[in-house]
Amino acid sequence: MYENLSEVLRLAESNHVKKTICIGTDLETSLKSVEIAEQYENVFATVGIHPHDSKDAPKNYLLELEKLSESKKVVAIGEIGIDNYRNHSPQDIQKKVMIEQMDLAYKLNLPIVFHNRDADNEIFDVLKKHPFHKALSHCFSSNLD
């Protein structure tokens, strides 16, 4: 998608899409999201470590996310959360990384974008115990109840 990004954005605009958010899922894609957002007026970015990538988060990832968040184009921390469906990272690490990123979002007064795949109880437990300003559920696999 990076190869024809201008065309994708042009088509989106021609279909009345006014703004687009490019989601970061690790440090590399978070940086790329910020770079893209800074190139296009109506594109914004999130920065974060996706649950799948939690086990590979470098020790300094919070500092790097905070630096990236200095861009005025960063509108949220995410995609963060817990994914019990694919289990690419151990659940305890996913939870730890989610909480750390929630703390960063709270400190920076940014909303969170969270990913919940077969993890309702775990996600709600974290959301109840840790403060956040606003949240967007990007992925969930349960019913509306």
What residue spans do the PLM features occupy?
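Mid-domain alpha/beta scaffold segments of enzyme catalytic cores
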Residues: 1-145
